[in-house]
């Protein structure tokens, strides 16, 4: 490949709305160009990277026994009504009509289409299990597309769906896919974590997310120093706290005239934030509750919503708070003599003693509060908080917190879609049995951006070698000055290509500084300079992109270094 024959257009200009490093660098490197909000054209350079990601994903899926197929991106309303997702999916589902006014959607996911295919094609248990996958463009009508291809409306995804006769067989394939995803992200050269996760809108019985570790990640991850335990912050748990502490203080009411925030109250009282208990007023289908958390902890909405009767909880408003407690936010507390207030205490709060709470009186808090003496034992004790850095993990290690970009997700869907769409096969006794399903997705185009978020410096992208557009760039200084120079470069190019090293020849005749800056920006792992001075000395200048190490090497040593 010669750059003089390749469309490469880099730029120094960055749009004001390009917030993430990956968005800025993909634009500067000429990998993508914006067509409309959330819609991007992939240039020849960007497509080379995208195709390399696809190739690794496809290779490992095939190795795992999955079979590739291709489903329509435009799908009929009737199919989505069978699964009851035509309305439930919400405004992200792009709906369209054809000339006959028949309604369709642009597929954001393909559970319905693949289930329809399978229920027509599979009739016997002897045809199971099967795992079908595709690599296809999807569309979600994001209300505010941002971050370039990280959260675009149109994106490339690998989605796979497995069908089974039994739950045990589904679990086996689920574990097969988890192992496959680990191989995929390892081959991509990325630092990643596999974490326990909530199944979200797709639903299902068990799920695991795969995250690329990056400071810019939107997801918060918790993992242990003691084992491979890792979870999304929504699902992460800490070790069960020890026994309740012994009460030593008496109850007192103290003035906190302007202090509403936990941090301000504890600063005024000169006590640790961990001694504060904050009260969060919530409304549920069964009435008013106070959810109690330690002062340095935050509420985990998902954990709270999973408690009996709290699936539809919401935060109480000021009118509701005044009606139930006669107070206002900032001074709420669970000590309510003469009133029957229902309390949900986080596990950590349930073992506290001598803690501080709001007095349900503006300008006052209570100190030295203890269970059983100053307020009744909580109606519910449960884990309703987010874990924090330094928590004791369930395996005895310490919890560490990092940010991640979700690039893969595996689900055990169960029979949710198969039951809704009547997808059955005959078992060995001739009885119709509903199939059980697994779902396995990878954000192919998102991986490209995530890789950049994890691998870059001030000069540009530093691609992991497996997905770089080229492994080696041979840069020619003054190619038109002396035919010997270009001949030597072409010979080196041929030798590298014959050794299956993906190589590009930069024969554009640009100034060295401009040429080198381009190669650093687009992230080529190895740069070789062919120059008149180097040839006279029998050497080539070699530079490793990741380490910035520069050496003058003879050809034999150079080729050995590149192939290593």
UniProtKB/Swiss-Prot annotation:
Top-tier EC class: ligase
The species this protein was found in: Xylella fastidiosa (strain M12)
Cellular location(s): Cytoplasm
GO MF annotations in UniProt: aminoacyl-tRNA deacylase activity; ATP binding; proline-tRNA ligase activity
Stated family: Belongs to the class-II aminoacyl-tRNA synthetase family. ProS type 1 subfamily.
EC nos: 6.1.1.15
Pfam families: HGTP_anticodon, tRNA-synt_2b, tRNA_edit
Superkingdom of source: Bacteria
Record text on subunit structure and interactions: Homodimer.
Protein's UniProt name: Proline--tRNA ligase
């Amino acid at each position: 490949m010669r750059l003089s024959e390749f469309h490469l257009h880099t730029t120094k200009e960055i749009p004001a709305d390009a917030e993430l490093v990956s968005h800025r660098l993909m634009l500067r490197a000429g990998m993508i160009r914006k067509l409309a909000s959330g819609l991007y054209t992939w240039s020849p350079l960007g497509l080379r990277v995208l195709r390399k990601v696809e190739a690794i994903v496809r290779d490992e899926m095939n190795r795992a026994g999955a079979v590739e197929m291709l489903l329509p991106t435009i799908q009929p309303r009737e199919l989505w009504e069978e699964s009851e997702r035509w309305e439930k999916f919400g405004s992200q589902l792009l709906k369209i009509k054809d000339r006959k006014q028949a309604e369709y959607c642009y597929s954001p996911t393909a559970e319905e289409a693949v289930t329809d295919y399978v229920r027509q094609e599979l009739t016997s248990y002897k045809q199971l299990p099967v795992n079908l996958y595709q690599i296809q463009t999807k569309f979600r009508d994001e209300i505010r597309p941002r971050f370039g291809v990280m959260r675009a409306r149109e994106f490339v995804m690998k989605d796979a769906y497995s069908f089974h006769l039994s739950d045990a067989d589904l679990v086996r394939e689920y574990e097969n896919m988890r192992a496959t995803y680990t191989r995929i992200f390892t081959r991509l050269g990325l630092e990643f974590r596999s974490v326990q996760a909530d199944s979200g809108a797709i639903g299902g019985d068990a799920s695991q997310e795969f995250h690329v570790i990056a400071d810019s990640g939107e997801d918060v991850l918790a993992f242990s120093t003691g084992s491979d335990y890792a979870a999304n912050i929504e699902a992460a748990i800490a070790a069960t706290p020890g026994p309740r502490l012994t009460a030593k203080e008496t109850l007192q009411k103290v003035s906190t005239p302007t202090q509403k925030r936990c941090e301000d109250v504890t600063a005024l009282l000169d006590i640790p934030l961990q001694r504060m208990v904050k009260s969060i007023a919530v409304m549920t289908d069964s009435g008013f509750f106070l959810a109690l958390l330690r002062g340095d902890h935050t509420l985990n909405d998902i954990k709270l919503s999973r408690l009996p009767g709290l699936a539809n909880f919401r935060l109480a408003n000021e009118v509701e708070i005044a009606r139930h407690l006669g107070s206002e936010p900032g001074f709420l507390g669970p000590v309510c003599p003469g009133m029957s207030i229902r309390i949900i205490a986080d596990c950590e709060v349930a073992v506290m003693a001598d803690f501080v709470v709001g007095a349900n009186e503006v300008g006052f808090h209570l100190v030295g509060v203890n269970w059983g003496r100053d307020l009744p034992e909580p109606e519910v004790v449960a884990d309703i908080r987010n874990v924090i850095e330094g928590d004791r993990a369930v395996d005895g290690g310490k919890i560490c917190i990092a940010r991640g970009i979700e690039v893969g997700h595996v689900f055990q869907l169960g029979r949710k879609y198969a039951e809704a769409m009547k997808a059955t096969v005959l078992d060995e006794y001739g009885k119709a049995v509903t199939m059980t399903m697994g779902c396995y997705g990878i954000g192919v185009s998102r991986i490209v951006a995530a890789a950049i978020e994890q691998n870059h410096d001030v000069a540009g992208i530093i691609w992991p070698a497996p997905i770089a557009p080229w492994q080696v760039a041979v840069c020619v200084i003054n190619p038109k000055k002396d035919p010997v120079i270009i001949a030597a470069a072409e010979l080196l190019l041929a030798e590298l290509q014959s050794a299956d090293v993906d190589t590009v020849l930069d024969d554009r005749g640009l100034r060295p500084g401009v040429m080198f800056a381009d190669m650093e920006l687009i992230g080529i792992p190895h740069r070789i300079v062919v120059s008149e001075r180097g040839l006279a000395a029998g050497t080539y200048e070699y530079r490793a992109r990741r380490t910035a190490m520069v050496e003058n090497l003879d050809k034999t040593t150079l080729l050995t270094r590149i192939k290593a």
